[in-house]
Regions:
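DNA major-groove recognition helix of helix-turn-helix/homeodomain DNA-binding modules
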Residues: 46-62
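Short basic helix-loop element that most often maps to the first helix and adjoining turn
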Residues: 5-25
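Recognition helix of helix-turn-helix/homeodomain-like DNA-binding domains
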Residues: 28-43
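Residue at a beta-strand N-cap/secondary-structure junction
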Residues: 16, 42-45
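Short, charged recognition helix plus adjacent turn
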Residues: 1-2, 10, 15, 35, ...
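Alpha-helix N-cap/N′ positions at the starts of helices
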Residues: 3-4, 43
């Protein structure tokens, strides 16, 4: 499954300004963040919970930010 992280990416820029600042607040490298946002590495549950805290959204919104499937155009 391929997930669409565009809403998450938008929230990152809105709250943190840059992906680099978000990665720093998450205690992960920018490379790791990039791999996660490009569906090369999975997000772990504690990382999703921490992201919700850093980006100030409710845990009930995790589905919107992390589990929206990417629609493929053929």
């Amino acid at each position: 499954m391929v997930y669409d992280y565009s809403k998450l990416t938008g929230r990152i820029v809105e709250v943190c300004g840059t992906r680099s600042k978000f990665a720093s607040r998450m205690n992960m490298s920018l490379r790791t963040l990039s791999l996660k946002l490009n569906n090369k590495l999975p997000w772990k549950q504690p990382e999703m919970e921490k992201a919700a805290k850093v980006l100030d959204f409710s845990l009930s919104d995790i589905q919107v930010y992390f589990f929206t499937l990417k629609v493929q155009n053929n």
